[in-house]
């Protein structure tokens, strides 16, 4: 029924739009080059009331739809160029008026203070990426980065917070163009501690070019944080309170000062988060039936601070530095209960294991960037980055394992364990990128050298039941050191062929030297280091063709690599209880993906993309039985022989009426996972998945803005073998601005019907497991934001050079 309503609403929206008129054109400068992302506004000729606002795309093209018949004039604004006007425009019923090429003139003065702000589309589809514009969406209030990723088009977040794009795992996560060296629980904690109010947009780059690192077989997700874009002294403050079963609160601020010599900017925030995650599992293993319930609560406090300065050294040179620091401190308590009984008679309970965990965690991160940029203002640029990042995590966990009889009245036995697992990761990087014109096109090249040093200590303690003394278990404790060096270089060339064809081709090479050294506390358990030394080549190419006016095709092909996250290489046993644990695999190979994408764009707005990828040695998460204890199972990582994915994505922004705008996104994929590990451990999984997402924005009376958004996800597969069932969610929001739009008050409700959970099953290697989970997803939030200061001129945006490595740390 939900799917039928969605399709009916889509048909109605398209029908309603078809009755209106449209206006389109192309913006170019005096030399005939496209003017991209210029602000465009259409006014009524009678009273100069603005009717519609937009922006030009990558080719300088723009289109205004949903217009009524009448007389208008158009104004286009771009920094450094004189304002452009097109007057005496008359539209009749159902007319599509093409203004052709509109040319700007150079400007010798700054823009006037009166500017027109163009509202961005929720999702922009470009040749190489999809941009999810978060800033300004009401339903992002009180949310966090992880929740926003669940809503992002083509993105899936599974029950263990693993992220995939169009069914492909191995996503590289960036923040402001810099790789985030975190994985696993550490990454989840970071994303949960990053308020949505600090996020400007999320860029999903499914097929990056040679300039980008080859890491990440599903591409790159780049979370772009807000940064004030104005000259002078200005800033903002935002405070949010959110209530579900537990509360969340945060306070965030930005500041910016710019003059002719330098630009200084800063952002910062503090937050407090409480939440829960409840899971329920039934497992059948070695003729034993286990029913497990795990209810966990997490309470954390965090802060983050970001400051930078750009010095303008002459007309063409900029020297800048950027510092990021953050800390997240959390306490996690969980109640874990497992009943054990014969598989034939599940009701005849043999014993019950109670394993209530308590953990204290602290995650600290610091990154430093020094940047030099040369730009001659025409065609030649040089960018150099020096980066250093430090990520330190500590975790102390106390875990009693107590076995009771079937009525939980008699303690049969107990075994108390404790864990101390500090991690220290250092990342060093230097990179340079150069671009210039050549042979009627543009050539680019560069290099990057990265060194990652990871020191992971895992100390396992047996706790004496009588006196509480901790005794280190040398057989289960270890130190894992990982040293990885990557030397990369690339070249890329692009040019236009006539007015309808554009092509680009690139080649990147990466030399990887990595050593994983597991140091044990008992000499008889010591194994030699695992050494990996390989050279890889990553070609890519793309071509775009304007088939006809308002019809364009884009074809992209490429090859990528995904190296294992640092934490999944460590083979220590990270226990949830004596019967359930995780352990890494130091022999994991990098996975290689070859992919091809074909995109079609209609009227510069409606987009269809079809992709096909083949991944060899795909790194996947599997649940397997323990070799020694027939009751126990563990989670580990292994390489699949092959994964094939056929994917599709459709996006359509629609203006239904003057006061009602909508966005629709439909994505689907077919996934085929294959592997044979011997002894009957076979992976042979084929599944379909689809996700329907839509957002509706309403301009209401009394200057109110309303928002309704929701998604429906069909069944699919997580990792190699876990088949999940469908789920859906609905969000509501309301916004009102005051004080000349400087004060913004927002109310929102997330997952109103509490359906954003998960259920599923896996059947692998003689072990069948099914279960589900829920978290604190239904929330009600209120937010207040205030902007102050001068808001006229833009400041420079830039990123650092270690985002890719940071994505593998696991924070």
Feature annotation, model-predicted:
Residues 293, 418, 427-431, 471-478, ...:
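Outer membrane beta-barrel strand-and-loop segments of large Gram-negative receptors
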Residues 357, 478-484, 532, 561-609, ...:
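Outer-membrane beta-barrel signature, preferentially recognizing the C-terminal barrel domain
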Residues 39-43, 77-79, 96-138, 158-160, ...:
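Short, acidic, small-residue-rich periplasmic hinge/interaction motif at the N-terminus
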Residues 101-103, 145-147, 187-191, 204, ...:
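N-terminal periplasmic accessory domains that precede
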Residues 125, 162-207:
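Periplasmic plug
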Residues 45-61:
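Short, acidic Ser/Thr/Gly-rich low-complexity loop/linker segments typical of extracellular
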Residues 246-274, 278, 288-334, 363-366, ...:
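Transmembrane beta-barrel wall of Gram-negative outer-membrane proteins
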Residues 304-328, 357-518, 546-550, 606-610, ...:
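Face-selective signature of the C-terminal outer-membrane beta-barrel domain
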């Amino acid at each position: 029924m939900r799917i039928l309503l969605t399709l009916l609403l889509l048909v109605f929206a398209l029908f309603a739009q078809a009755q209106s008129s449209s206006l389109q054109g192309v913006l170019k400068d005096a030399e005939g080059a496209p003017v991209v992302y210029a602000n465009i506004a259409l006014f009524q000729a009678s009273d100069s009331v603005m009717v519609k606002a937009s922006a030009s795309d990558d080719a300088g093209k723009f289109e205004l739809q949903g217009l009524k018949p009448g007389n208008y004039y158009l104004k286009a604004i771009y920094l450094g160029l004189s304002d452009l006007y097109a007057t005496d425009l008359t539209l009749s019923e159902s007319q599509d008026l093409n203004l052709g090429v509109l040319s700007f003139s150079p400007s010798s003065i700054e823009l006037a203070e009166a500017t027109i702000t163009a509202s961005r589309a929720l999702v922009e589809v470009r040749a190489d990426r999809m941009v999810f514009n978060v800033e300004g969406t009401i339903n992002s209030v009180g949310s966090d980065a992880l929740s926003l990723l669940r809503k992002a088009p083509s993105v899936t977040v599974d029950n263990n917070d693993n992220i995939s794009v169009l069914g492909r795992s191995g996503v590289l996560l960036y923040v402001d163009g810099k790789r985030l060296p975190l994985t696993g629980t550490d990454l989840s904690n970071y994303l949960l501690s990053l308020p949505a109010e600090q996020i400007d947009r999320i860029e999903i780059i499914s097929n990056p070019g040679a300039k980008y690192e080859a890491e990440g077989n599903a591409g790159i997700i780049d979370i772009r944080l807000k940064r004030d874009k104005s000259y002078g002294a200005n800033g903002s403050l935002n405070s949010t309170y959110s209530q579900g079963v537990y509360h969340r609160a945060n306070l965030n601020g930005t500041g910016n000062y710019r003059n002719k010599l330098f630009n200084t900017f800063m952002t910062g925030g503090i937050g407090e988060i409480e939440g829960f995650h409840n899971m329920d599992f039934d497992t059948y293993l070695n003729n034993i039936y286990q029913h497990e319930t795990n209810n966990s609560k997490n309470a954390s406090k965090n802060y983050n601070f970001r400051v930078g300065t750009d010095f303008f050294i002459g007309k063409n040179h900029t020297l800048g530095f950027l510092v990021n620091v953050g800390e997240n401190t959390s306490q996690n308590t969980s109640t874990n209960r497992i009943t054990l009984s014969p598989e034939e008679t599940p009701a005849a309970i043999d014993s019950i294991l109670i394993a209530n965990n308590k953990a204290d965690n602290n995650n600290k991160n610091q990154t430093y960037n020094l940047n030099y940029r040369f730009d001659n203002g025409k065609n030649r640029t040089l960018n150099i980055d020096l980066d250093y990042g430090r990520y330190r995590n500590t975790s102390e966990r106390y875990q009693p394992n107590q076995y009771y009889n079937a009525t939980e009245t008699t303690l049969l036995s107990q075994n108390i364990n404790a864990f101390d697992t500090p991690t220290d990761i250092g990342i060093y990087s230097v990179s340079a990128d150069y671009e210039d014109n050549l042979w009627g096109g543009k050539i680019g090249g560069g290099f990057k050298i990265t060194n990652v040093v990871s020191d992971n200590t895992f100390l396992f303690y047996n706790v004496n039941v009588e006196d509480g003394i901790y005794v280190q278990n040398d057989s289960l404790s270890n130190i894992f050191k990982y040293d990885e060096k990557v030397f990369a270089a690339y070249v890329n060339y692009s040019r236009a062929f006539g007015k309808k064809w554009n092509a680009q081709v690139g080649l990147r090479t990466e030399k990887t030297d990595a050593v994983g050294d597991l140091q044990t506390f008992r000499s008889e358990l010591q194994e030699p280091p695992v050494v990996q030394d390989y050279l890889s080549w990553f070609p890519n190419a793309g071509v775009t063709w304007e088939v006809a006016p308002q019809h364009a095709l884009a074809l992209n092909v490429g090859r990528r690599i995904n190296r294992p996250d640092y934490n999944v290489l460590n083979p220590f046993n990270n226990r949830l209880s004596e019967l359930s644990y995780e352990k890494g695999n130091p022999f994991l190979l990098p996975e290689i993906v070859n992919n091809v994408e074909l995109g079609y764009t209609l009227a510069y707005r409606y987009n269809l993309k079809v992709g096909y990828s083949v991944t060899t040695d795909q790194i996947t998460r599997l649940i397997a039985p323990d070799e020694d204890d027939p009751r126990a199972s563990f989670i580990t990582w292994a390489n699949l022989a092959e994964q094939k994915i056929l994917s599709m994505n459709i996006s359509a922004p629609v203006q239904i009426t003057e006061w009602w705008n909508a966005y629709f996104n439909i994505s689907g994929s077919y996934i085929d996972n294959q592997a044979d590990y011997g002894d009957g451990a076979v992976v042979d999984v084929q599944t379909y998945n689809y996700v329907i997402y839509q957002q509706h924005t309403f301009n209401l009376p009394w200057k109110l803005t309303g928002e309704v958004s929701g998604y429906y996800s069909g069944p699919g597969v997580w990792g190699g073998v876990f088949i999940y069932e469908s789920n859906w969610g609905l969000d509501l929001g309301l916004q009102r601005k005051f004080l000349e739009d400087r004060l913004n008050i927002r109310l929102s409700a997330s997952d109103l019907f509490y359906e954003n959970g998960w259920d599923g099953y896996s059947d692998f290697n003689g072990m069948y497991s099914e279960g589900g989970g829920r978290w604190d997803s239904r929330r009600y939030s209120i937010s207040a934001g205030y902007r102050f200061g001068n808001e006229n001129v833009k400041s420079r945006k830039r990123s650092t050079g270690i985002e890719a490595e940071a994505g593998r740390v696991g924070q």
